[in-house]
Amino acid sequence: MHDAVELLRAPLAVRRNVRLCAELGADIVKTNWPGDGDAFARLVEAAAGIPLVLAGGSRLGDRELLGRMEAATAAGGIGCSVGRNIFMHRSPEAITRALSRVIRERWSADKAFTELQEAAPEGAGEPPGGAPVGREGPA
């Protein structure tokens, strides 16, 4: 089954699915990260004018999340749907502000990450692992 999941996440398959959403009349499409900004730009093109938002997927480190969002926005994405990366964050307010800076104010991921480190310094940018920050045991 792992191979089937990987096949569905392949850039060509994701692009085809975005195009299908556009052809079926979607008002907006939430899509997975295809690997880099150029591939995301091809998704924007495939969407034929339908706005794209970046899905969060697995819990990411802060720097990686902000970097993906910077690349997606530069490629024509309009926002993100990254709930897990916000509500599991040690400072949901700070990561939301950092994402807003990148998306709405066109800050670089590095600049937003620096501000995030100042606002929520403990472990800023560390890769995910263990229990969600700020929780004791299972949620």
Positions of PLM-derived features:
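Flexible loop/turn segments at secondary-structure boundaries
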Residues: 60-61, 87-89
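Alpha/beta enzyme core
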Residues: 1-53, 60-78, 101, 107-111, ...
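Short strand-loop junctions, especially beta-strand C-caps/beta-turns
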Residues: 55-58, 85
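Short acidic/histidine-rich active-site segments
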Residues: 80-87
